[in-house]
């Protein structure tokens, strides 16, 4: 079995090979993903360490899924974005049947991923005795403010983490990332213009609606007056016909 040990505090990861003799002395079925285990079960060099089980895969590469209480391979109906079904595959709302491993360890697990929760007495070479600094700093404006404890009125462009680019035969230069979600006067003006255009559009639509309703009302009023005039004309003609008939008698 291969064991990937990660130490997020130092940003280091290293893979170790665990022999079958060591695994025979351990009841792997007693552990599942999310549990904290004593590092001594993987060898005497990890004595005193506390590991948290994060993931793994079997010999065929099927990943372990948290929450599936099984020590064997199961077939799950999963949606896009789940373990085993990438987001860029399939259609929106589609579900597929995928084979995954349960969260319980077994003897046929080929790889286990763990993180260090508690450091032991002896350092692990390449994990706890070294530090891998982050190559890139934060890019989003809110995260830069959080890193340097800046207020919303301070300019974050002065605090961007720059890195030095070294190329043979060329002068060294500093490279900085483009700040995302940065609020500048240009952004404020664009948002104000967008809001102003939206308000003007609503007002123009309301004015057109009022004009349309006024036109409809005038047409209906003219139609009622025309109908009333026709009825009055028919009534007058009927009365005149009655008078003429009465006079003939």
UniProtKB/Swiss-Prot annotation:
Gene3D superfamilies: 1.20.5.2650. The keyword Kinase does not apply. InterPro entries: Ribosomal_eS6 (IPR001377), Ribosomal_eS6-like (IPR014401), Ribosomal_eS6_CS (IPR018282). Ribosomal protein S6 is the major substrate of protein kinases in eukaryote ribosomes. Residues 223-249 are annotated as: Disordered. GO terms for molecular function: structural constituent of ribosome. One of its GO terms (biological process) is translation. Keywords: Phosphoprotein, Ribonucleoprotein, Ribosomal protein. SMART domains: Ribosomal_S6e. Belongs to the eukaryotic ribosomal protein eS6 family. This is Small ribosomal subunit protein eS6. It comes from Leishmania major.
